[in-house]
């Protein structure tokens, strides 16, 4: 039978709370609460106070995916610390489906942001004149719908009704998609990021640094360091080896903490990039976010003009 989509979370946690379980889950709750606050503020600013462009649509959806992912993280860690268990396997599988969909959606949004930026740099004329107007909105809808549909089909045909009703062909197809789709997204993310870096440092017409470019690069870097390890444990390890050793369990718990750091890091990145070399005394959060997503190279002249325009009511 094909490997299932359920992550090792429910299968590897000891019955009693020990230090290896207590500390990681407390850290997840702390990082999660910080991330929930940051992503709520980010979602509020992007959704109601800024004019949305192609990149802001992706960033808005990424903030929503991070918020929901952190919420699930906090719920799971709280249940573990309180020794509360879901009443049946169907609810366990539903929870796993939600976590898997949110992880894939976050990776998809990040890949879309990097690819969109790559296209805007490598094909600027096509991007400004020929790109369909509602591409970002349509693509975000597909990004949410596709993994949700596949994971629901996988859970329905592979888990909800027990081994007697398993349809092997559907399980094989959906499991193959769930294992390979994140790999494809990771390859797209890496290739688009490398293309941007190559154009920046090696291209004939070198692209100048913008705050948006720095924001995207830092977001990708944090994901590679903090978000990718959990994907390895969720999508590859169960396929290669079903048995978890003590070391695997410790590494898995570490990857859970790191992914909570990844999901709470983006608002911090935006604040850091938006406030770098700027005085914060008279700047609102909206102005800091606008600065972090600024897509024009900074010169002393336009920095003065931008600060004057933002100071106006």
From Swiss-Prot:
Keywords: Cell membrane, G-protein coupled receptor, Glycoprotein, Membrane, Receptor, Transducer, Transmembrane, Transmembrane helix. Expressed in a subset of sensory neurons that includes nociceptors. Expressed in the subclass of non-peptidergic sensory neurons that are IB4(+) and VR1(-). Glycans are attached at residues 10, 76. GO terms for cellular component: plasma membrane. Residues 1-25, 76-93, 159-182, 241-255 are extracellular. Residues 47-54, 115-137, 204-219, 277-313 are cytoplasmic. Coiled coil: none annotated. GO terms for molecular function: neuropeptide receptor activity. The keyword Cell cycle does not apply. It is found in: Cell membrane. The chain crosses the membrane at residues 26-46, 55-75, 94-114, 138-158, 183-203, 220-240, 256-276. It is a multi-pass membrane protein. Belongs to the G-protein coupled receptor 1 family. Mas subfamily. Orphan receptor. May be a receptor for RFamide-family neuropeptides such as NPFF and NPAF, which are analgesic in vivo. May regulate nociceptor function and/or development, including the sensation or modulation of pain. This is Mas-related G-protein coupled receptor member A4.
């Amino acid at each position: 039978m094909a490997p299932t989509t359920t992550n090792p979370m429910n299968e590897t946690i000891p019955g009693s709370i020990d230090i290896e379980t207590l500390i990681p889950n407390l850290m997840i709750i702390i990082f999660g609460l910080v991330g929930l606050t940051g992503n709520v503020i980010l979602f509020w600013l992007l959704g109601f106070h800024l004019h949305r462009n192609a990149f802001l649509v992706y960033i808005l959806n990424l903030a929503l995916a991070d918020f929901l992912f952190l919420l699930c993280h906090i719920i799971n860690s709280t249940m573990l610390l309180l020794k509360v268990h879901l009443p049946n396997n169907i609810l366990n599988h539903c929870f796993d489906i939600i976590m898997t969909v949110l992880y894939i959606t976050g990776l998809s949004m990040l890949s879309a942001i990097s690819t969109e930026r790559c296209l805007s740099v490598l094909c600027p004329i096509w991007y400004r004149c020929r790109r369909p107007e509602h591409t970002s909105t349509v693509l975000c809808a597909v990004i949410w719908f596709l993994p949700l549909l596949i994971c629901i089909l996988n859970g329905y045909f592979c888990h909800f009704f027990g081994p007697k009703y398993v349809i092997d062909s559907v399980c094989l197809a959906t499991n193959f998609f769930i294992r390979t789709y994140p790999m494809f997204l990771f390859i797209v993310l890496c290739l688009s990021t490398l293309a941007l870096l190559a154009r920046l440092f090696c291209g004939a017409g070198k692209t100048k640094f913008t705050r948006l470019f720095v924001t995207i690069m830092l977001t990708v870097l944090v994901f590679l360091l903090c978000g990718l390890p959990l994907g390895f444990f969720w999508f590859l390890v169960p396929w290669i080896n079903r048995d978890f050793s003590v070391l695997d369990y410790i590494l898995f718990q570490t990857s859970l903490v790191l992914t909570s750091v990844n999901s709470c890091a983006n608002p911090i990145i935006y604040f850091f990039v938006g406030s770098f070399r700027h005085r914060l005394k008279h700047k609102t959060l909206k102005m800091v976010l606008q600065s972090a997503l600024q897509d024009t190279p900074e010169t002393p002249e336009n920095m003065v003009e931008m600060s004057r325009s933002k100071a106006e009511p």
